[in-house]
């Protein structure tokens, strides 16, 4: 089984059980791959909690998904991730840059509904 990276909103939707938000391809990829997240997702979840876009803590979300579906944090060297992110000049969003860069280090698929990522990262998938 290969590994697929999950964008932050995918992690939130999985935690909330919002499977109706997923495309058929997204559901298939989730069910047939190991699921990985960039550690920066943890920080983005904290930001979302602070601005009250979500109500659960990052640890609650990630621990629940780790236990329920085997979601795991990527352990790639952060220096390598940042150097890769420096090449992604199509976005000013640091979270999108780092999440995409983490996936790009190994040309891994990134599951996202983000239109900018889908337009610029060849391995981004949604539908």
Please name every model-derived segment:
Residues 1-37, 51-63, 116:
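Short, well-structured N-terminal submotif of metal-dependent ribonuclease cores
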Residues 8, 78, 96-97:
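Conserved glycosyltransferase catalytic-site signature
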Residues 60-89:
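Acidic catalytic patch
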């Amino acid at each position: 089984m290969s590994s697929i990276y999950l964008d932050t909103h995918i992690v939130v939707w999985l935690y909330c059980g919002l499977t109706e938000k997923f495309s058929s391809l997204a559901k298939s990829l989730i069910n047939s791959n190991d699921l990985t997240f960039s550690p920066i997702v943890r920080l983005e979840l904290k930001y979302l909690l602070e601005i009250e876009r979500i109500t659960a803590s990052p640890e609650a979300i990630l621990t629940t998904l780790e236990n329920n579906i085997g979601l795991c944090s990527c352990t790639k060297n952060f220096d390598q991730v940042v150097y890769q992110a420096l090449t992604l000049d199509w976005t000013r969003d640091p979270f999108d840059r780092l999440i995409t860069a983490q996936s790009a280090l190994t040309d891994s698929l990134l599951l996202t509904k983000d239109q900018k990522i889908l337009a610029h990262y060849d391995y981004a998938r949604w539908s």
